[in-house]
Every structure is written in structure tokens, then in C-alpha cells.
């Protein structure tokens, strides 16, 4: 065996375990009210570092600093007054009056920047890239799973998307599922409810999950 062929064999051998690795999660689902089969395949779960920018996008903004006390009247009041006006930035920036960034826009940016962790496949050739994948034990022996796709579910199959869509401008979709030990359960999505930050569990979530309509019937 020559040196170059030995190196090639070594590189291929290193790559084989990654290719042959089992997905962290594989589920099958059907959209309710439509004969639309879906396959959910998660290669791996998000790391804390990968989830952090998306959680930060929905975190409450930090409290604004208290304004400085007005200068006391006296001999130096004139100089103090001029300094105060200059500090505001006048015509230049209007610093304190700037509108806070839109949480939806921040989350969209964070989703796009995240690595692809899997796909949700429909009956076509185009899948939905999964950019966020989290799971934890839930009630009654079930597992809670939260996924975020970069594109809106149903973007290429509008016939099965429930109407009205709560956030029609959102490019991504948050999918939250509850499944039992056999992989049977339900899934709901941000197509019909809003996205929230579950601060206790430290994950993205659906606001009012229990009241949201079921979008997916899930099986293993």
C-alpha cells in the first residue's frame, strides 16, 4: 500500500462512523385534516451554545437605566444645562428614543444562522431544515420535543396549512410535540399560536400549548 492510498483509507475510515450513525430521533406524522405524510429526522440535539442565540432573541429586554438627576440650581447651572443637552446627542442619534429590536426579526436571524440538525420531509423532494432540536421528559411518561424549521411548514403544500395563520410573516415554524415511549403522540405548531420562551425549561415553546389545535398525529 502506498503512502497516499494509506492516507485515503484512513480518511474514509474516520468518516464512516459519522455516516453510519443512527439519527437521534425518527418519527412519522400525518397532518390533521389532510392526507399529508411527514417524516421527522433529527441527526442530533442542539447544544446549549447553539440554542442560546434563539433563547436570547425572546428574552425580556434589560431594564432601561434610570435618568440622571437634574442639576441643582446655582452658579454652575448654565454649564450643567449645556452639558446635558449635548449628552442627549441632539440631532445626531436620538439614542434613548430608538425602538427596541423586533423579537420576531431577532429570532428569524438566529434561526437562519444555526446549523442544520435534521429535516422534516413531506411527499416531495424538498425538506424543511431543522435548526433547533430540544427534548425533555414531560408529564405522564411522555417526552416533550421542540423543533424549529427554517422555513414555514406547508410553504410548498398550502392546501394543508391551517387557517388563519397567526404569524403569516414568520419564515420559520416552531413545532412542539408530546410523544409516549412508543413514539405515539401529537404535534402543534406556531402556525396556529404564538412562540414563547419557556424560561423554566430554557427552551423555545408554544404559548398556550394545551389550548392550541393539534396539527400532527405522530407515530414512530
Kindly give the residue locations of the regions a language model identified.
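Tryptophan-anchored aromatic micro-motifs
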Residues: 21-36, 108
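Compositionally biased alpha-helical segments
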Residues: 52-59, 96-98, 108
Amino acid at each position: 500500500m502506498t503512502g497516499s492510498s494509506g492516507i485515503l483509507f484512513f480518511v474514509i475510515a474516520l468518516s464512516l462512523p459519522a455516516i453510519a450513525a443512527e439519527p437521534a430521533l425518527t418519527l412519522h406524522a400525518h397532518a390533521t385534516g389532510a392526507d399529508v405524510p411527514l417524516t421527522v429526522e433529527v441527526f442530533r440535539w442542539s447544544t446549549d451554545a447553539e440554542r442560546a442565540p434563539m433563547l436570547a432573541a425572546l428574552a425580556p429586554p434589560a431594564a432601561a437605566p434610570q435618568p440622571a438627576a437634574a442639576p441643582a440650581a446655582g452658579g454652575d447651572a448654565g454649564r450643567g444645562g449645556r452639558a446635558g443637552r449635548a449628552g442627549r446627542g441632539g440631532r445626531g442619534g436620538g439614542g434613548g428614543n430608538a425602538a427596541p429590536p423586533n423579537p420576531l426579526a431577532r429570532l428569524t436571524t438566529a434561526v437562519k444562522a444555526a446549523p442544520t440538525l435534521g429535516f422534516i420531509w413531506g411527499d416531495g423532494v424538498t425538506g424543511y431544515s431543522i435548526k433547533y432540536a430540544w427534548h425533555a421528559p414531560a408529564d405522564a411518561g411522555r417526552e416533550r420535543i421542540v423543533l424549529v424549521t427554517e422555513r414555514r411548514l406547508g410553504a410548498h403544500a398550502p392546501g394543508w396549512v391551517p387557517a388563519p395563520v397567526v404569524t403569516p410573516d414568520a419564515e420559520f415554524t416552531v413545532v412542539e410535540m408530546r410523544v409516549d415511549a412508543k413514539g405515539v403522540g401529537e404535534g402543534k405548531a406556531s402556525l396556529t399560536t404564538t412562540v414563547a420562551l419557556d424560561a423554566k425549561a430554557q427552551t423555545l415553546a408554544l404559548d398556550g400549548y394545551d389550548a392550541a389545535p393539534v396539527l400532527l398525529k405522530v407515530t414512530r
